[in-house]
Amino acid sequence: NGTMQNTSTALTKVEPSKSTETVELKNGDSYDLTASYVEKDINGVKYKMLAYNGSIPGPLIKVPQGAEVTINFKNGTDMNTLLHSHGVRMDNKFDGSQSSQEEMKPGETFSYKLKFPDAGMYWYHPHVREDYQQELGMYGNYLVVATDEKYWNKVNREIPLILDDVLIENGKINLSKKEADHTLMGRYGNVMLVNGETNYKLSATQGEVIRFYLTNAANARPFNF
């Protein structure tokens, strides 16, 4: 089963990562989202990583176009962090960047009131120490469903895929928690992840039409299809 690799702190109890869930919200709903450490198995070795609501990627949050929802975010890590909703048009005070609010200290909570005026796929991630927090698994998707049924061509299924790469050397994910290192400037990983898995599999039937939503959460790597 491998051993627990210490990438960050000496936390004694870390829960295993869970499968990513899909959460459907409607206008006016609230949802609780927590960032915390998890134990993640990669090719038989357990690593201490970071996650939203215990999964890598975090929950797929599905909302109708035009909806306004509240994300009650808790910082369950031992570092400062923020929740940035990438590409979503919103009030600046809920942008989740250092220019819009103070960094959230460990244990603090903040309610992000988000509006989703545009259909499509977006993603959320930290805007503090992305070289560390995002690299260890803090990312997830929003799927904004178009109000116009003809906005997209009809398909049999929709599948979001988050692509990532992790750099593992000598059995460890070596990241500097104390300060940002060269990782911030870009690096290639040597282990590919699709929806958090090294061996992601998908079954399809002949004639089935599938719409894929692709998010590149890798540090610097381009992906060719």
For each predicted feature, which ranges?
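Histidine-centered copper-binding motifs that mark active-site loops
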Residues: 2-225
